[in-house]
Amino acid sequence: MSTHILPEAFTQPQPCSQPPKEVHLVTPSERQVPYSGHVKPFIMVTTRPEHEAARDEYESFLTQSGLSRNELQHIALEEVDFFGSFTAADVSGVLIGASPYNADTPTAEKTRSQLHVEDQVRELLAVILKEGIPLLATGVVLQVLAAYLGTGTREEFGEELGAVDLFLTAEGREDPVLAGLPQAVTVFAGHYEGVGEVPAHATLLASSPDCPVQMLRVGRNVYACQFNPELDAARFEQRVNIYDEAGYGDPDMSEDILSHARSSEVHDAGQIIRNFVSHFSRT
């Protein structure tokens, strides 16, 4: 697998274009208060082909972020050309959601939709890395980013859908986007493959027993996590039900998954989204 050459600024931790600032830990009770209208918007990019799931994902990120709809604008890669809509100077940052696609599906077996989305994500990652745009990506996008940096995925690092225990590394405990989280965190996740090695130029921030690379950072402002920080227990149940209705899941198995999820003490991983927004918002 070929490795893309990163701009020199990304081979070592460098300051982003805006001066670093302290993170204000936004609490759940504060998160509905919109940011100032002078802040440049964040862009939420959804990669899911199912419209209901994509809308639900946007609403989950919106709720967790504390932004208004104008401050967190939604783009579905299936429908809109990101680069025809925004430039790096227009935005505070980008958030990219997960999808039901598997990065290691043989090319001949991938749908046209998956191929299009993967091409768009790779192109978007290239621009983000080149321009230094702050990014928070989730799910399969971590795998696409790892592949872009020369590291593949393996099925042995997949995790069943449900609550997952992960642990912050020393670097993760010092990172402003993970500020306020305990060293051991329980979150929602579920994926067929995972990344087992930290890619070149990346810093490992969180790991789990079954998936060594749960969250990483490239440079100072590009983040990717394998889990779903936007999901709380209610949103997780809603997401599972949406995919059941779309014919992806087994209702009996889903009930077992939901029963286990209801009994799990999941942390407020949405703090990651709020920290990201607080740290990288710019005028």
Language-model-detected regions and their locations in the chain:
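Amide-donor transfer/coupling interface in amidating biosynthetic enzymes
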Residues: 3, 27-38, 44, 90, ...
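Acidic, Ala/Val/Gly-enriched low-complexity intrinsically disordered segments
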Residues: 8-9, 22-26, 33
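N-terminal beta1-alpha1 ligand-phosphate binding loop
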Residues: 34-38, 42-57, 62-66, 76-78
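Glycine/Thr-rich phosphate-binding loops of Rossmann-like dinucleotide-binding domains
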Residues: 52, 103-105, 146
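Flexible gly/pro-rich beta->alpha loop and the following alpha-helix that scaffold active-site loops
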Residues: 70-136
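Ligand/cofactor pocket segment of small-molecule handling proteins
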Residues: 141-144, 148-188
